[in-house]
Amino acid sequence: MGKIIGIDLGTTNSCVSVFEGNEPVVIANSEGKRTTPSIVAFVDGGERKVGDPAKRQAITNPTRTIFSIKRFMGENWDQVQKEIARVPYKVVKGDNNTPRVDIDGRLYTPQEISAMILQKMKKTAEDYLGQEVTEAVITVPAYFSDSQRQATKEAGQIAGLEVKRIVNEPTAAALAYGLDKAHKDMKIAVFDLGGGTFDISILEFGGGVFEVLSTNGDTHLGGDDFDQVIIDWLVQEFKNDEGADLTQDPMAMQRLKEAAEKAKIELSSSTSTEINLPYIMPVGGVPKHLVKTLTRAKFESLAHNLIQACLEPCKKAMQDAGLSNSDIDEVILVGGSSRIPAVQKLVEDFFGKTPSKGVNPDEVVAVGAAVQGAVLTDEIKGVVLLDVTPLSMGIETLGGVMTKLIDANTTIPARKSETFSTAADNQTEVTIHVLQGERPMAAQNKSIGQFNLTGIAPARRGVPQIEVTFDIDANGILKVSAKDKATGKEQAIRIEASSGLSKEEIEKMKAEAEANAEADKKEREKIDKLNQADSLIFQTETQLKELGDKLPADKKAPIEAALQKLKDAHKAQDMTTIDSAMAELNTAFQAASAEMYAQSGAQGGAQAGPDMNAGQSNAGQNNGKQDDNVQDADFEEVK
């Protein structure tokens, strides 16, 4: 059985892990980093960059660099207006009242953008394992709705991954934390404040069973919001000083975003930081600089409401779990924003104990996902995970009321049936409107789907018996069915994401993603070949200078001819000619090396020929990389 990788698909950063050698391993990406920015950039020529390469060019390409796409996942157009106002890239209204990212007229769903990030994580794992990866456990915020979970699953499918399980992020963190403590009896609180979302989950584990008692949170509260209060402050300060509005300049706003994130991070370990952005914007034709000192106290004042917003979900989670603060044995901090000192103080004050620093907030969720993957493949035995549904689910009934079938914090998988009837005489059809949320009226909750049950036998109002069944799987994804008990007619719906993507659309996007992955691979191979040629040109020119007149003219000519051919091919990026020119150059050097060896005998020839040839061979076979174990040596001939 192949490996099931664990992926933390984050708002700001993503991380991938795999269970290997009886322990979870966090895998470094091609840039050598253990976390990857959740950023996708589209650059000239159709090339696509993901992760750190995308982040590095964001300032000069703000309108085609996509970040925080997780905040758009599974949401409809009306729910993301606040997010749209914050991002420099173009978001438009697409099919089914959904947000789409517009890149040069091509509309991308949030799932497609997320799939590009997932492809990067998949490739990272494949490079590490040396084998193809097709299965994954992907984490989501505990407070993600059904449609947001479904959208995450679709993103995985588009990326070429079979999503074996969707796991709540705090639950994954608890799995990672408690793996070596699974047979102790403990109650823990996982406080997860990430880049875009906030979750609080209360868990109990013992005897290998991890049971989620309650969960609460806010899917639109996270590090992005803390960055935004700094950005808003800087914009206002510049307006006060210079009378100009930075929000009108996308490039300036991208610089502000990077500076705000950097300042927020620095203020976790320092009491003040300087924000220095030279030439931020011309005012009246004169370049202006933005230089401000931000203290930790000022930042905490700016972010006061955000920090306090974490408190109410904590209270509700504890209340739903039926526990008092003294019942909690350990508090685990997860997510980069949990490093903010004021947040840590709030957690300590609320729970009455110092939070544990025993886990890496940036990696623990991916580690937990890998642990869940190992549980599914039986690499880990004796561990049972009992998660919950974060929000109540029900249907709309007479008078626009929401009637709950499954309450929030119900352990999943779960199944519940209730019998309803018609609201009018001789009614032969009913509409089942499926809702998710905690409010009493249907209009106040999130609509996640609807379907019709037809062919009901005509009868007086209240006589027909219609059995409605809600079935939630282990991923927290819902299936609803309705059955007329008299006729036996039944209709069912598996709630899809609010994106409304059909299987055909998902398959089409998957094919496009695979095609792009192949194009990306070819582009990397092309760059490697160009670098290889560039290295060979440099080494050849260096050795020609060093050898000087020692190299016979009849041997030097073919080397120079092949070198010029390689230079021309490199400039034109003619890959076929590059291959032949490199082969000719190596052949010419080998011929020269052999003759010089024969002429100079065992002393001089043994030094000049093979050394010269080895240099070309290394350049041709190691993609232009120098071998760290090879050192240049100076030789002195003793006569």
Swiss-Prot record:
<feature type="region of interest" description="Disordered">
    <location>
        <begin position="600"/>
        <end position="639"/>
    </location>
</feature>
<dbReference type="InterPro" id="IPR029047">
    <property type="entry name" value="HSP70_peptide-bd_sf"/>
</dbReference>
<comment type="similarity">
    <text>Belongs to the heat shock protein 70 family.</text>
</comment>
<dbReference type="InterPro" id="IPR043129">
    <property type="entry name" value="ATPase_NBD"/>
</dbReference>
<keyword id="KW-0143">Chaperone</keyword>
<keyword id="KW-0547">Nucleotide-binding</keyword>
<dbReference type="GO" id="GO:0140662">
    <property type="term" value="F:ATP-dependent protein folding chaperone"/>
</dbReference>
<feature type="compositionally biased region" description="Low complexity">
    <location>
        <begin position="613"/>
        <end position="624"/>
    </location>
</feature>
<dbReference type="InterPro" id="IPR013126">
    <property type="entry name" value="Hsp_70_fam"/>
</dbReference>
<protein>
    <recommendedName>
        <fullName>Chaperone protein DnaK</fullName>
    </recommendedName>
</protein>
<dbReference type="Pfam" id="PF00012">
    <property type="entry name" value="HSP70"/>
</dbReference>
<keyword id="KW-0346">Stress response</keyword>
<dbReference type="InterPro" id="IPR018181">
    <property type="entry name" value="Heat_shock_70_CS"/>
</dbReference>
<feature type="compositionally biased region" description="Acidic residues">
    <location>
        <begin position="629"/>
        <end position="639"/>
    </location>
</feature>
<feature type="modified residue" description="Phosphothreonine; by autocatalysis">
    <location>
        <position position="197"/>
    </location>
</feature>
<dbReference type="InterPro" id="IPR012725">
    <property type="entry name" value="Chaperone_DnaK"/>
</dbReference>
<keyword id="KW-0067">ATP-binding</keyword>
<dbReference type="GO" id="GO:0005524">
    <property type="term" value="F:ATP binding"/>
</dbReference>
<keyword id="KW-0597">Phosphoprotein</keyword>
<dbReference type="GO" id="GO:0051082">
    <property type="term" value="F:unfolded protein binding"/>
</dbReference>
<dbReference type="InterPro" id="IPR029048">
    <property type="entry name" value="HSP70_C_sf"/>
</dbReference>
<comment type="function">
    <text>Acts as a chaperone.</text>
</comment>
